[in-house]
C-alpha cells in the first residue's frame, strides 16, 4: 500500500476468497501476478499498477471486492464518514502495515479506509 502522496485516493482492492492457495495459483497462472502471503488467511498481490489482496472467508459475500482508500488521518476520515451519512461497519483495527475501518456509504456500498498510523 502507498502512503501520503496518495491521500484520499483508492489505494488497494481486497477480494474475498474461499481458498488462498487455489486463488494464488489461478491469478499467477492467468495474469502473472506476484503474491506475498500473510498467513493462511490472507495474501496480497501486485500487478504492476495496483495492489490488492485476497482474504479467506467462509462464504463469498454478495458484495464482491472491497475498495480500500488511503487516509493520512484515520480518525478525521472516520468522523467525516459518519457526519456525511455513512455507517461504520467495522471499527478501526490493526492489520499488518497499519490500521483501518470499514463503512457503508449512503447507497450501501462497503468500503474501507486505511492509514499506516
Task: State where each predicted segment sits.
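Conserved acetyl-CoA-binding loop of GNAT-fold acetyltransferases
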Residues: 30-35, 85-87
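A short acidic/small-residue loop/turn micro-motif
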Residues: 96, 116-117
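Catalytic core of tubulin tyrosine ligase-like
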Residues: 27
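Amphipathic alpha-helical "stalk" segments
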Residues: 1-4, 46-50, 76
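N-terminal beta-strand motif that seeds the catalytic metal site of vicinal oxygen chelate
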Residues: 1-24, 65-67, 117
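Vicinal oxygen chelate
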Residues: 69-110
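Conserved short beta-strand elements that form part of the metal-binding/catalytic scaffold
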Residues: 33-64, 110-115
Amino acid at each position: 500500500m502507498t502512503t501520503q502522496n496518495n491521500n484520499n485516493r483508492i489505494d488497494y482492492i481486497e477480494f474475498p476468497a474461499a481458498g488462498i492457495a487455489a486463488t494464488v495459483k489461478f491469478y499467477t497462472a492467468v495474469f502473472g501476478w506476484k503474491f506475498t502471503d500473510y498467513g493462511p488467511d490472507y495474501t496480497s498481490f501486485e500487478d504492476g499498477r495496483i495492489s490488492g489482496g485476497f482474504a479467506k472467508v467462509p462464504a463469498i459475500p454478495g458484495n464482491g471486492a472491497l475498495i480500500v482508500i488511503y487516509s493520512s488521518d484515520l480518525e478525521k476520515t472516520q468522523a467525516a464518514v459518519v457526519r456525511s451519512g455513512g455507517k461504520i461497519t467495522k471499527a478501526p483495527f490493526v492489520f499488518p502495515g497499519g490500521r483501518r475501518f470499514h463503512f457503508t456509504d449512503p447507497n450501501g456500498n462497503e468500503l474501507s479506509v486505511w492509514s499506516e498510523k
